[in-house]
Design a protein with these regions (language model features):
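Glycan-recognition and catalytic cores of secretory/periplasmic carbohydrate-active enzymes
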Residues: 1-316
Length: 316
């Protein structure tokens, strides 16, 4: 998408890359569509998708998002072919879910983290755990199979294990935080944390698990209390890792942050989330803010190239 002054797409294809708030999202104690509309992720209902890599190279969020996108298309028109596609993605996640040991319930990545952060295999991602749980809960509700529900419950296990013990639970400003990339020191990636905690909400609401509901509320409160740290005064931050310069979000991720916080205002409203949405939208409409964000992103990538492991970031 060509850049438009005052629009986040000025320095990325933000509108096409960043999906909107889910059209079938249920605000009350019901599970409908996903919080973010991943429909564009699934172009056809054929499984496996052509991008699926070997076991040792897979990023499990890609599988979960493809399945959630297929489920969204099923909700659009009731086409059972799309539900079967979502189910195929869920079956794939069941096959790859770790059984036993310190990574029990997790979807382990068997390759090093390919960019920005240094993570050696095997490593887990709270984002993958949450999105995987969200897909499996929906498959259970659609077909009644308990094995999907049980796998969704198990997916939450690593969220209760500290990063230092091979889990994905960290602490930020005295509250819990779920790490997309469980680095030490913490990276605190905003979009990944939001995708992660939605898995807790889906297990809580869809499977009537009160403990998951309590964890979701604690995490929502904690994130609301620390959301100000992602506001640079002109744009949002991608993470809080102590890089040499702040990792300003790309236009696409800035828009994703905005849409994710809009979804949070539907299911777990907090004044801090609403204030962040207003600020982020104001920045996106500002030509000077957009230009400044572009300049800082360029500087960041000069110092921390995307295609090279970040120096100084210790593995788990």
């Amino acid at each position: 998408m060509s850049g438009i002054p005052g629009n986040p797409s000025r320095f990325s294809s933000a509108r096409s890359f960043s999906p909107p708030v889910g059209r079938h999202l249920e605000p009350l104690d019901r599970i409908g569509g996903y919080y973010i509309d991943f429909g564009e992720k699934a172009q056809t209902p054929r499984w496996p998708p052509p991008w699926l890599k070997s076991r040792r190279e897979q990023l499990h969020v890609s599988t979960a998002q493809w399945g959630l996108g297929a489920y969204e298309k099923f909700l659009d028109g009731g086409d059972e072919e799309w539900l079967a596609a979502a189910r195929a993605a869920g079956e794939h996640l069941l096959e790859l879910q770790t059984a036993g040991g310190p990574l029990d319930g997790g979807w382990a990545h068997l390759h090093p983290m390919p960019h920005t952060f240094r993570l050696d295999p095997p490593w887990l991602s709270a984002m993958a755990q949450g999105e995987g749980a969200s897909l499996l809960v929906r498959l259970h509700l659609a077909g009644g199979e308990e094995r999907f529900a049980e796998a969704a419950r198990r997916a939450l296990g690593p969220m209760r294990v500290p990063v230092a013990a091979s889990g994905v639970l960290a602490e930020l400003e005295g509250g819990p935080f779920l790490e997309e990339y469980p680095t030490q020191p913490g990276s605190y990636v905003l979009n990944g944390a939001l995708f992660a905690i939605w898995g807790l909400r889906d297990v809580a609401v869809g499977l009537r698990e009160s403990s998951a509901g309590a964890e979701f509320e604690r995490l929502a409160d904690s994130l609301a209390g620390s959301i100000h740290r992602y506001d640079l005064g002109f744009w949002s931050r991608y993470d809080l890792y102590p890089h040499r310069v702040a990792n300003v979000a790309s236009g696409a991720y800035h828009l994703l942050h905005t849409n994710q916080l809009k979804a949070m205002q539907i299911v777990a409203p907090r004044p801090q989330f609403g204030a962040a949405v207003a600020a982020y939208e104001r920045y996106a409409d500002s030509r000077p803010a957009t230009a400044r964000a572009l300049a800082q992103k360029v500087l960041f990538r000069l110092l921390v190239p995307r295609n090279r492991l970040a120096k100084g970031a210790a593995s788990r």
